[in-house]
């Protein structure tokens, strides 16, 4: 996969302020505030920055955490997991494999079959409904 690289200024011009804060500056939207937290629409969730397909709605589940949760990304290299030691915690950050947008974090407390919970900010996603 070819990497998409832009300067922070280019991203700032392209994204709205909330998208820029979360995707490029590694922010987090408030829990239960995202438009996809309770969405049941079937489709594929794409990266808001580069349109790369990331997650399928068939892997989405209600974790109760306040952010859209998935038990697996799309097959292949849709996302990359990166060690995150910010805020005095040790976590695993999830970024888009194509453009390095911060998406959220992955935790080992999800349902079968993976046991993982990809906790993703809605503002980072664009849902393309299945036809």
UniProtKB/Swiss-Prot annotation:
Residues 8-130 form the MsrB domain. It is an enzyme of class 1 (oxidoreductase). The keyword Transcription regulation does not apply. GO terms for biological process: protein repair; response to oxidative stress. Disulfide bonds: none annotated. Zn(2+) binds at residues 47, 50, 96, 99. Keywords: Metal-binding, Oxidoreductase, Zinc. It catalyses: L-methionyl-[protein] + [thioredoxin]-disulfide + H2O = L-methionyl-(R)-S-oxide-[protein] + [thioredoxin]-dithiol. It holds the Pfam family SelR. Gene3D superfamilies: Peptide methionine sulfoxide reductase. The keyword Amino-acid biosynthesis does not apply. PROSITE patterns: MSRB. InterPro entries: Met_Sox_Rdtase_MsrB, Met_Sox_Rdtase_MsrB_dom, Mss4-like_sf. GO terms for molecular function: peptide-methionine (R)-S-oxide reductase activity; zinc ion binding. GO terms for cellular component: cytoplasm. HAMAP family: MsrB. Belongs to the MsrB Met sulfoxide reductase family. This is Peptide methionine sulfoxide reductase MsrB. It comes from Pseudomonas savastanoi pv. phaseolicola (strain 1448A / Race 6) (Pseudomonas syringae pv. phaseolicola (strain 1448A / Race 6)). The lineage of its organism: Bacteria, Pseudomonadati, Pseudomonadota, Gammaproteobacteria, Pseudomonadales. The gene is msrB.
